[in-house]
Amino acid sequence: DPTQPPWGEAEHKEWQARRMEVYAAQIDRMDQGIGRIIDSLEKTGQLENTLIMFLADNGGCAEEIGEAWSKNVVGSISRRETRDGQPVQHGNDPNVMPGPEETYQSYGVPWANVSNTPFREYKHWVHEGGISTPFIAHWPEGIGDRGALRRQAAQLPDVMATCLEVAGVEYPQEREGNAVQALEGFSMMPIFSDRAHAREVLYWEHEGNCAVRKEQWKLVCKYPGDWELYDIVADRTELNDLSAEHPQIVAALGALYAAWAERCKVMDWSELQEMRRKEREG
């Protein structure tokens, strides 16, 4: 991110370092919790035949917590008070060191930039920095290769399809007389044995930011901009926009995206914003 200065030029270094320290401590806590689950599975003899899938749902989050942000989330994803009734101070204020229970901050743009390097953008957008995450699968009785790397692409809907295949159950077509939305995911079981994935095309949409990927080509839009085209194999960091050179590929991928958006009932972001505006105005 060219807007972010190098560490030598950064302001409030002590506060910035503390933000990452708190983030790292949260990761450590999560790791300890996962470790307790694994220990329990091992003690009960279930670890070898339990499929564990670990992944993030998006790239690094560059959201800075300010007053307006806090008003929208306090009471929903954060607490107004600590467990002993003390008020929680929300907001990324360099004069307040994060960490204690009575503070609520984020690690912000600088550390999200570190997390996502070398990819572009962050959570919310669908360039690689917003969507590319690691995925770990552990299942000793079901996955032959241990510690092996796989390079086939998959995405979140494939987790559901994988669970269905592992459990040996069919995805329902209706529930209580109502049709169920068709399953969009494809099982990742072939990937576990290093075979080709059934998924040929990947799709994304988040608040108007759109993308579709097929083979080496990725078509992506940063709302409200135009489509950009990248050879994601040769240019994973999305620096060389080839849309002007390959208009036929842009058209073909754009048609795939439009069909997917219609099938999955993706609302046009501009229309959705206008609908919300009218609702607010009564």
Language-model features and meaning:
Residues 1-20, 138-144:
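Short glycine/proline-rich turn/loop motifs
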Residues 11-50, 60-61, 66-112:
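A long, amphipathic alpha-helix that forms part
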Residues 17, 21-28, 150-154, 182, ...:
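Soluble non-cytosolic domains of exported or imported proteins
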Residues 24-27, 31-38, 42, 116, ...:
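Non-transmembrane alpha-helical segments in soluble domains
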Residues 53:
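Conserved catalytic/binding loops enriched for acidic/polar residues
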Residues 100-131, 138, 143-152, 156-234, ...:
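C-terminal cap/loop subdomain of S1 sulfatases and analogous C-terminal strand-loop tails that border
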